[in-house]
C-alpha cells in the first residue's frame, strides 16, 4: 500500500488531467456534425478525428467508472476515518467526469435537445463537486504535512527501539553467561572445587589471561594467594602475600562493587606475575561461616573477605566495561553463597560425625546399663528366691500344724505366726516387684475376712513385740466392730504392725496402747484428719479407726524430737521394711488415711489409722471361706497316685508331706527329665502330676507339653502347677500347655486340698 500523501497527490493530478479533455470535448461539440471540407483527406480527416475522440471518450468514461471502485475498496480496507469523506468526494467527482465523457460520445453526430440538457446537467454537477473537492483538499493539506512530521518522529522512535533492543540482547547475553556460571559453580559443594570452577568459567566467558583468589591468613594480618588459574613460571615468596593494610586491599573490602586496579597496583602485579597483562579488576567475596546462620540473638562478628582478581590479556582488544563488571559482581555473589553452603555442609558433616560418636557412646552406655540392670535383677531374683523358698516351706509346715488339736491360746499363737509369716511373704513380693519393675505401685486383694480374728492376732503379735522390748502393753477393742468385712487382710495387718514397730523403735521404756473402734464420719467431720475419700461400695460400709499410742516414762525421753513427724520417708522407721510414705499410699488405695500426733511435752506420740470396709452380711460356707488359713475339714484323697516334681529339696519335702497329709501316694522326683522317664515305664499309673513351673534345667511348661505328647494315645494324667505368680500371662501359658490347675505359692494344706478337689471334680 503506497503512502497516504503520494496517493492523494496522484488523485489530484488525475482530476486536473481528466478535467481538460472534458472541457475540450465541450468546446469541440459546437462543431459536431459540421465539415467545412477544408480538411485534408486520409487519416487526419474530420470523420476520423471525431471517431478517435468518441473512442477516447468511451475509454476515459470506463476508466473514470473503475477508479471510484478502487477508491471505495481502499477506503473500506484502510483505517482512514478522518480522510474517508475526501475519498468519497473524489469518487463522486470522477464518476461525474466519466458520465460527462460518456454523454459527449453522442454529441459528435446530430443529437437531440435532451442530450444537450443531460450534458449540461452533468457538467454543472461536475463543476459543483470539483469546487467542493478543491475546497476540502485545501483544508487537508496541513494534515498531510503533519503526517510527514509524524513519519519522521516514528523513524526516530524506531531507531531508539533498535538501541533498546540491542541493549536488551546484551543484557540477555550477560544473564545467560551469569546463569551458565552459576550452574557450573553450584555443581559442587566442595569449596576448592567451587573456586577452581569459578576461575575456569570466568576465564572462558571473559577471555581472561589469569584469575586468582586471595584469602585472609589465620592471624588476619595479610592476604595469601591460595588459588590461581595459571601457575606462574617464577614466583617470589614475597609475592604470595600482601599486607592487609594495602590501599587496594582496603578499598576493595570497603565496597561490594568490582574495582579496576591501577597498572602499578601491588595486588595486580602479584596476581599476573612476571607476564605482561592487560587491565586488572578485583572484587571482594564474603567468607561466611555456618555459625552466622544459627538462630537466636545475632552476635557481632567481624566479616571475613576473600579477594577475586581477574587479569585480561595484553593485546588491548578487551577492557573492563559496565557489562563485564556487572557479570563479575553477580558471579562473586553467587560464589559467596556457594561457599557459605559448602561451609554449612562441612560443619554439618562434622556435627554428624560428633553425633554418630555420641550415639555409639550412648549405645555402649545403654548396653552396659542393660547388662548392669540384668545383673542386678538376676542378683535380686536369686536373693528373693533364697528368702522366699524357706518362707514358703515354713508356711507349708505351719499350715499342717494348724490342723492339730490345740487349746485356744495355742491356736491364737499359731494363727498369729501364720499371719505374720504371710505378711512377710507378701512384703518380699512387694519389694521384688518395686525393685525389679522400678515402680511404686502395689496391688490390693479385696476379699472377705474376719475382722475380730485379725484384731486378736494383731494383739497377740504386738504383745510379743512389746514384751521383747520391755514395754508395757494395753488394748481396748470396741464391741460394736463387725465380724465379717471385705478388704485386703494382709495389707491391714501389715500397716498395724508397721505402726507398732515405728513407735516401739523410738521408745526404750513406757506403755503402748492399742485402741480399735468404729466412728461416725459425720460427727467427726470438724477434724480435717478424719476426712476420707468416699469408697465406691455397692452396699453398706463401716469406718474403723486403729489408734496406737506410746507414752514415755518420766525417767526416759523419746529418742526423736517432739516436732518430728512421720511424713517423710525414712528407711529405718519401719521394722517391716516399707517406709511411712509407702504405707500412706497403701492406706489411700484402701480409701483411708494415716497420720501422727505428738504430745506437746514430748512424752508421747500417737499414730492413727482410719479405714473403710465393706460389710458382708451373709456368712460364707466354711468350705468356701476366703481366709488364707482355716481350720475347716480338709478333703482326703485316699489312694490317689501323685508324682511330685520340684527341684528345691526343702519345698519338695514339705509339699510331699502335705500330699501325704491329704491321703495321696506320692513319688517325688527332682527334675522334669526324671518325671518324663517315670511315665516311660509300663508300670506307671500316676493319676496326678504336681510340678513346679520354675525348675532349673527344664521348666514346668515344657514338662507338661512333653507329658501330653508322650501319653497322647493313653488317658493323660491331670497336671497341677505350683507358681509364685498367678497373673493372666501365667494362666494363659498354663492353658496352652494343658495344665489343669494352678496353685500360688506358698503352698498350704488348705489351698492344696481345695485345688486338687476342684481339678478332680472338673475332670
Swiss-Prot record:
Changing residue 491 to Q: Loss of kinase activity. CDD domains: HATPase_ETR2_ERS2-EIN4-like (cd16938), REC_ETR-like (cd19933). GO terms for cellular component: endoplasmic reticulum; endoplasmic reticulum membrane. The modification 4-aspartylphosphate is found at residue 692. The lineage of its organism: Eukaryota, Viridiplantae, Streptophyta, Embryophyta, Tracheophyta. Gene3D superfamilies: 1.10.287.130, 3.30.450.40, 3.40.50.2300, Histidine kinase-like ATPase, C-terminal domain (3.30.565.10). Coiled coil: none annotated. This is Ethylene receptor 2. The chain crosses the membrane at residues 58-78, 86-106, 115-135. Pfam families: ETR1_N, GAF, Response_reg. One of its GO terms (biological process) is response to ethylene. It is a multi-pass membrane protein. Induction: Induced by water deficiency. Residues 641-760 form the Response regulatory domain. Residues 190-339 form the GAF domain. Its EC number is 2.7.13.3. GO terms for molecular function: ATP binding; ethylene binding; ethylene receptor activity; metal ion binding; protein histidine kinase activity; protein serine/threonine kinase activity. Cu cation binds at residues 97, 101. Its cofactor is Cu cation. Keywords: ATP-binding, Copper, Disulfide bond, Endoplasmic reticulum, Ethylene signaling pathway, Kinase, Membrane, Metal-binding, Nucleotide-binding, Phosphoprotein, Receptor, Transferase, Transmembrane, Transmembrane helix, Two-component regulatory system. Changing residue 501 to A: Loss of kinase activity. It comes from Oryza sativa subsp. japonica (Rice). Autophosphorylated on serine, threonine and tyrosine residues. Plants over-expressing ETR2 display reduced ethylene sensitivity, delayed floral transition and reduced seed set. It is an enzyme of class 2 (transferase). It catalyses: ATP + protein L-histidine = ADP + protein N-phospho-L-histidine. Belongs to the ethylene receptor family. It comes from the Eukaryota.
Amino acid at each position: 500500500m503506497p503512502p497516504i500523501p503520494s496517493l492523494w497527490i496522484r488523485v489530484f493530478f488525475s482530476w486536473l488531467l481528466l478535467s481538460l479533455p472534458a472541457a475540450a470535448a465541450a468546446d469541440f461539440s459546437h462543431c459536431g456534425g459540421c465539415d467545412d471540407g477544408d480538411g485534408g483527406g486520409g487519416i487526419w480527416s474530420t470523420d476520423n478525428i471525431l471517431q478517435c475522440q468518441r473512442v477516447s471518450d468511451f475509454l476515459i468514461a470506463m476508466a473514470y467508472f473503475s477508479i471510484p471502485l478502487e477508491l471505495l475498496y481502499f477506503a473500506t480496507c484502510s483505517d482512514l476515518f478522518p480522510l474517508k469523506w475526501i475519498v468519497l468526494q473524489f469518487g463522486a467527482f470522477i464518476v461525474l467526469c466519466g458520465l460527462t465523457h460518456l454523454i459527449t460520445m453522442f454529441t459528435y453526430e446530430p443529437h437531440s435537445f435532451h442530450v444537450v440538457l443531460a450534458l449540461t446537467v452533468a457538467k454543472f454537477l461536475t463543476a459543483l463537486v470539483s469546487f467542493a473537492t478543491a475546497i476540502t483538499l485545501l483544508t487537508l493539506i496541513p494534515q498531510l504535512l503533519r503526517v510527514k512530521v509524524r513519519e519522521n518522529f516514528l523513524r526516530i522512535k524506531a531507531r531508539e527501539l533498535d538501541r533498546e533492543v540491542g541493549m536488551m540482547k546484551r543484557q540477555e547475553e550477560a544473564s545467560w553467561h551469569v546463569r551458565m556460571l552459576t550452574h557450573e559453580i553450584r555443581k559442587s559443594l566442595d569449596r576448592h572445587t567451587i573456586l577452581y570452577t569459578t576461575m575456569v568459567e570466568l576465564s572462558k566467558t571473559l577471555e581472561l589471561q589469569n584469575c586468582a583468589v586471595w584469602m585472609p591468613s589465620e592471624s588476619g594480618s595479610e592476604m595469601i594467594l591460595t588459588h590461581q588459574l595459571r601457575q606462574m613460571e617464577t614466583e617470589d615468596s614475597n609475592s604470595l602475600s600482601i599486607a592487609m593494610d594495602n590501599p587496594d586491599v582496603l578499598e576493595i573490602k570497603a565496597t561490594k562493587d568490582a574495582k579496576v586496579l591501577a597498572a602499578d597496583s601491588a595486588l595486580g602485579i602479584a596476581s599476573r606475575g612476571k607476564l605482561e597483562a592487560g587491565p586488572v579488576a578485583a572484587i571482594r567475596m564474603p567468607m561466611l561461616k555456618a555459625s552466622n546462620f544459627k538462630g537466636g540473638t545475632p552476635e557481632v562478628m567481624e566479616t571475613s573477605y576473600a579477594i577475586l582478581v581477574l587479569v585480561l590479556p595484553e593485546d588491548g582488544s578487551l577492557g573492563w566495561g559496565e557489562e563485564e563488571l556487572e557479570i563479575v559482581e553477580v558471579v562473586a555473589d553467587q560464589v559467596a553463597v556457594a561457599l557459605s553452603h559448602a561451609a554449612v555442609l562441612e560443619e554439618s558433616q562434622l556435627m554428624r560425625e560428633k553425633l554418630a560418636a555420641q550415639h555409639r557412646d550412648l549405645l555402649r552406655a545403654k548396653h552396659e546399663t542393660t547388662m548392669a540392670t540384668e545383673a542386678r535383677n538376676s542378683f535380686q531374683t536369686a536373693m528373693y528366691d533364697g528368702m522366699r523358698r524357706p518362707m514358703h516351706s515354713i508356711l507349708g509346715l505351719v499350715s499342717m500344724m494348724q490342723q492339730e488339736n490345740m487349746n485356744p491360746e495355742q491356736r491364737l499363737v499359731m494363727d498369729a505366726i501364720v499371719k505374720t509369716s504371710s505378711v512377710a511373704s507378701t512384703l518380699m513380693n512387694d519389694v521384688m516387684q518395686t525393685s525389679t519393675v522400678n515402680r511404686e505401685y502395689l496391688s490390693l486383694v479385696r476379699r472377705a475376712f474376719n475382722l475380730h480374728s485379725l484384731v486378736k492376732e494383731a494383739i497377740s503379735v504386738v504383745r510379743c513385740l512389746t514384751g521383747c522390748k520391755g514395754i508395757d502393753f494395753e488394748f481396748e477393742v470396741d464391741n460394736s466392730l463387725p465380724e465379717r468385712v471385705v478388704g485386703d487382710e494382709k495389707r491391714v495387718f501389715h500397716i498395724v504392725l508397721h505402726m507398732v514397730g515405728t513407735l516401739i523403735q523410738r521408745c526404750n521404756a513406757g506403755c503402748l496402747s492399742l485402741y480399735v473402734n468404729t466412728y461416725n464420719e459425720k460427727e467427726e467431720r470438724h477434724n480435717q484428719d478424719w476426712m476420707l475419700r468416699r469408697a465406691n461400695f455397692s452396699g453398706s460400709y463401716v469406718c474403723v479407726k486403729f489408734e496406737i499410742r506410746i507414752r514415755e516414762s518420766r525417767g526416759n525421753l523419746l529418742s526423736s524430737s517432739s516436732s518430728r513427724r512421720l511424713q517423710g520417708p525414712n528407711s529405718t522407721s519401719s521394722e517391716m521394711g516399707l517406709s511411712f510414705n509407702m504405707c500412706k499410699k497403701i492406706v489411700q488405695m484402701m480409701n483411708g488415711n494415716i497420720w501422727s500426733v505428738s504430745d506437746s511435752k514430748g512424752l508421747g506420740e500417737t499414730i492413727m489409722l482410719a479405714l473403710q470396709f465393706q460389710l458382708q452380711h451373709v456368712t460364707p460356707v466354711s468350705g468356701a471361706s476366703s481366709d488364707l488359713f482355716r481350720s475347716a475339714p480338709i478333703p482326703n484323697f485316699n489312694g490317689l497316685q501323685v508324682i511330685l516334681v520340684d527341684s528345691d529339696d526343702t519345698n519338695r519335702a514339705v509339699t510331699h508331706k502335705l500330699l501325704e497329709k491329704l491321703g495321696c501316694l506320692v513319688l517325688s522326683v527332682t527334675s522334669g527329665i526324671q518325671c518324663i522317664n517315670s511315665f516311660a515305664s509300663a508300670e506307671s499309673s500316676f493319676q496326678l502330676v504336681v510340678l513346679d513351673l520354675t525348675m532349673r534345667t527344664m521348666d514346668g511348661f515344657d514338662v507338661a507339653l512333653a507329658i501330653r505328647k508322650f501319653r497322647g494315645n493313653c488317658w493323660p494324667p491331670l497336671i497341677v502347677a505350683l507358681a509364685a505368680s498367678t497373673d493372666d500371662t501365667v494362666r494363659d501359658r498354663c492353658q496352652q500347655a494343658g495344665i489343669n490347675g494352678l496353685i500360688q505359692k506358698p503352698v498350704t494344706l488348705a489351698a492344696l486340698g481345695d485345688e486338687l478337689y476342684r481339678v478332680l471334680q472338673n475332670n
